[in-house]
Amino acid sequence: MKGYVVCVYKGISSEEKLKEYAIKARSAVEKYKGKFLIRGGKTTTNEGSKSPRTVVIEFPSYDDANSFYNSREYKEAHKILMSHAERHHQTIEGS
């Protein structure tokens, strides 16, 4: 079954750091054969709090998605954004 990384941002304090993070994270996504399904875009908040950004990445498997998140490459990218964004981050197994 496919694996998905879902990231719902609650707040972003630096668009510049977000761009820097995105460039570095992209190479880790590609290394683990991830495919971006959603990166920002137009949204309608139907329930709950409005989010400034949502990202969904599909991986060949749940294990690949977890390997991506726990990889050295992604951890380096994550450090760039840590104090510049608040977000909810999950790895989900598809059906």
Give, region by region, the residue ranges found by the protein language model.
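C-terminal structural segments of small proteins and small subunits
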Residues: 62-90
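Short S/T/G/P-rich N-terminal loop/turn motif that feeds into the first structured element of a domain
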Residues: 1-53, 60-66, 70, 93-95
